[in-house]
Amino acid sequence: MSSFVTNGYLPVTLEPHELTLDIKTNIRNAVYKAYLHREISGKMAKKIEIREDVELPLGEIVNNSVVINVPCVITYAYYHVGDIVRGTLNIEDESNVTIQCGDLICKLSRDSGTVSFSDSKYCFFRNGNAYDNGIEVSAVLMEAQQGTESSFVFLANIVDS
């Protein structure tokens, strides 16, 4: 995983009942809810600091709500094709084999190996190696996929040890 820090403006929408004396708290909560730990366009905000030293731009009324561009210092994380990650092998059935790596889900394609069911548990076989469900494995990221709301998703292959 790689990361970078940038200054930017994050647009958030506030409803009229949120425009009270607690507006700073409501803005902070709206920014965190909309952007923190959410995968958007291949990157995820891991840390957001709202800049108090910069004046807040005027809001814009849109459909009976107020859109505010909030000045922030944002630490983004992202993954590259070719990165090697480590996580837990999760075999739900023959067609759904993933590796869970915190904020990253690696999907293994059918041609990555075969799934077998023996001794009341699933096993994944690749190049003569057997991997039990639930063990720690390493994988190389092959192709970015459409992410979920709070996770990156990549096609990956297990790195044979």
From Swiss-Prot:
Gene field: OPG119
EC numbers for this chain: 2.7.7.6
Q: Which reaction does it catalyse?
A: RNA(n) + a ribonucleoside 5'-triphosphate = RNA(n+1) + diphosphate
User: Which organism's genome codes for this protein?
Assistant: Monkeypox virus
Q: Where in the cell is it found?
A: Virion
Q: What's the protein name?
A: DNA-directed RNA polymerase 18 kDa subunit
Q: Which GO terms describe its biological process?
A: viral transcription
Q: Does the keyword Protein biosynthesis apply?
A: no
Give the record's GO CC terms: DNA-directed RNA polymerase complex; virion component
